[in-house]
């Protein structure tokens, strides 16, 4: 396919509209974080705007990088020094744009991290709830599983071992989930009457909460649970604008 040249700002306006980005009070700016020096024909997507992803994008002759975890987070030192300075120098010297969408990409009902993870894990009857600003989703397994078999299913589908705490017996059918670092929503998930709650990370207190709530909790990886939304958005943009697109996986066990 011959890629079509696109003004990056046209693409940003489209993304802002599709993802309803203005609705979210986020922890970092959504949209165009660093403006490159040329029109967009080749797009690389990835989870996090790390040095490894930037270098991989440059090797692919990308004009822009699309990520879920970008730069300029609130309460973070804004100065471009140390590794942040090195990342910025590498990106700017290559003339590559950086595009990031955080909460809007978590929440989108088709392209978002929660929606795409649910499909990846073969959940059915999926829908967002009113809890956690709509970021907490609920659904069912097509067939009930034991906690052990559910853990194995998730591990296989995500190609990463999931860590289980809390409930060890009984049947898992109704599931709540929220990608990334959302273990703090465990009590809200339990209030939905689900058998299991899945997110990316595990905190010290999560183990005790899961046990006391009688809930099966799976920590399936922050990175692993947030790989699929940015892939879906990148693919959608490639089809919409006639771009060349490739998702680059930078392994992260966290």
Swiss-Prot record:
Signal peptide: none annotated. One of its GO terms (cellular component) is cytoplasm. It holds the Pfam family DUF34_NIF3. One of its GO terms (molecular function) is metal ion binding. A divalent metal cation 2 binds at residues 69, 222, 226. The keyword Protein transport does not apply. It comes from the Bacteria. A divalent metal cation 1 binds at residues 68, 106, 226. Keywords: Metal-binding. Belongs to the GTP cyclohydrolase I type 2/NIF3 family. Homohexamer. PANTHER family: GTP CYCLOHYDROLASE 1 TYPE 2 HOMOLOG, NGG1 INTERACTING FACTOR 3. This is GTP cyclohydrolase 1 type 2 homolog.
